[in-house]
Amino acid sequence: MKRNTEKFHFNSTTFMQLISLTIILVLIAPVMTTAQAGKANFAGDWTLNAEKSTQPPGGQGGAMRMGGGNFLVTQEANILTVVRTRTGQDGQPTTSTMKYTLDGKESVNTSPRGESKSVATWSADGKSLTIETSRTMDINGESRTMKSKEEWVLTDSKSLTVTIARKSPDGEVKAVNVYDKK
């Protein structure tokens, strides 16, 4: 009889531990799911839809200079990675990779045009992402700082709108680029 009691006691303790763990998981899981499910996922291979996009008038910035062109996005955990391949002035393709942390902390990216510092922040509802960037460049021996603000919004699962505003000593230029998911 003593043997059966010990066995029951062991099972009872194990059972209580399992119940406690289950209760904790039931309470934590919805919070974790809501935190992840509430944020837009921009991952995909995106192609510029020139017909739906709006570029600045004149020669102030073609689609390529205002963030246009095709790009690939991966969004894993707390990192948004944007890979763009463009044709350079020499006709050769060049690839640039920008990484942004999605927690409101500063990200630093380096390119042939200089170092950029960016902060990405989510809207309160998690449906849009704003990326504010500051880049200092040397142009013809003169140091210039350009600031940009991009707002990324998924209009549906196959369409991404990126609204861009760039400020420089020459003024502000705005563009709206619409992308279709491949």
Q: What are the language-model segments listed below?
A:
Residues 1-16:
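N-terminal secretory signal peptides that target proteins for export/translocation
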Residues 9-10, 18, 101, 180:
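Compositionally biased, intrinsically disordered low-complexity regions enriched in proline and serine
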Residues 17-30:
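Bacterial N-terminal signal peptides
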